[in-house]
């Protein structure tokens, strides 16, 4: 099957004797540009960067730090100190708080063929995390790749995103135990998915530019989902892999509902997203079983 599809790969045992995994083989080791943007739930950028530098086996990467005008002076000083490293550079964002626009500007400064958008509250777990994501994103039919993120208490933060849950979008398998295999093995098997969060999102620069990058109208939320759906529109696949593992030091209580109470922008961007992607949302998430509940992220049967 892999040979017919033109995907050189080695097949290995997976999580169990009945599940297998394909290790896709590529002759190139492209430069990966890791773009880190500041957020409100960070430990600090220094810990994230140290984690990358100490625990990443893949040698060919650069780090781009987005420095916005609202950062505290001590944070700005920290960024400048970090930027003295050979791998690390900064890009200043002087505009208003806009995640999409800031990251689009950062992309302009990157030298890599592959982009990795990363929150500054991330801690690397396995040394080959970049290789695990890269093997998928280098496939010509793949647009973006997401990783397996854990909360600090070792419960699952997400296995990708599901559209339609709670009339919006929610994390797949949120709060599941660390060692859970998930719904039909989804937490231990690489699989296609509709959308991926930008907390750890890898995409080829060519694909990112082809779809127009992040939509600046999504300054606070939905920019990553919009990007994912634009990638699907171009007939690329979005892939989630359980073999790239990271901790995300993000509060369990912080989600779209809590943001709504604090930010009027969220309601406007939500309405814009629902209008822009009305046809897709009406049809339902193609990677989610229509017999399952849309009330929770636990893959339980829908009670009609």
Briefly describe each language-model feature range.
Residues 31-35, 62, 226:
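Cell-envelope/extracellular polymer assembly enzymes that use nucleotide-activated donors
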Residues 50-60:
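Short, acidic, metal-binding catalytic loop of nucleotide-sugar glycosyltransferases
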Residues 67-78, 95, 123:
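A conserved acidic beta->alpha catalytic loop
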Residues 93-110:
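Glycine-rich, basic loop-to-helix element that forms the pyrophosphate-binding segment
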Residues 115:
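Short aromatic/hydrophobic "clamp" motif used to bind/position activated sugar donors
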């Amino acid at each position: 099957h892999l040979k017919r599809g033109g995907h050189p790969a080695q097949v290995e045992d997976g999580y169990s004797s009945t599940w297998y995994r394909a290790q896709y083989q590529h002759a190139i080791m492209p430069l990966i540009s890791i773009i880190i943007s500041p957020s409100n739930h960070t430990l600090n950028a220094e810990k994230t960067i140290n984690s990358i530098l100490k625990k990443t086996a893949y040698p060919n990467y650069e780090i781009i730090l987005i420095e916005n005008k609202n950062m505290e002076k001590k944070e700005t000083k920290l960024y400048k100190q970090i930027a003295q490293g050979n791998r690390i550079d900064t890009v200043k964002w002087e505009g208003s708080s806009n995640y999409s626009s800031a990251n689009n500007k950062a992309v302009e400064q990157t030298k890599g063929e592959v982009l990795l958008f990363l929150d500054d509250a991330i801690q690397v777990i396995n040394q080959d995390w970049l290789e695990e994501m890269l093997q998928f994103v280098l496939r010509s039919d793949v647009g973006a790749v997401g990783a397996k993120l854990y909360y600090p208490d070792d419960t699952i933060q997400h296995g990708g995103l599901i559209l339609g849950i709670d009339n919006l979008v929610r994390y797949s398998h949120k709060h599941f135990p660390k060692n859970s295999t998930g719904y039909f093995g989804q937490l231990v098997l690489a699989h296609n998915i509709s959308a991926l969060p930008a907390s750890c999102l890898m995409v080829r620069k060519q694909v990112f530019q082809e779809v127009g990058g992040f939509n600046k109208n999504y300054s606070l939320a939905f920019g990553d989902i919009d990007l994912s759906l634009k990638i699907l529109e171009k007939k690329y696949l979005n892939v989630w892999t359980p073999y790239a593992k990271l901790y995300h030091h993000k509060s369990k209580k912080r989600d779209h509902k809590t943001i709504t109470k604090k930010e009027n922008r969220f309601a406007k961007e939500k309405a814009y997203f629902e209008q822009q992607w009305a046809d897709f949302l009406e049809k339902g998430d193609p990677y989610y079983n229509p017999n399952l509940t849309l009330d929770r992220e636990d893959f339980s049967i829908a009670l009609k």
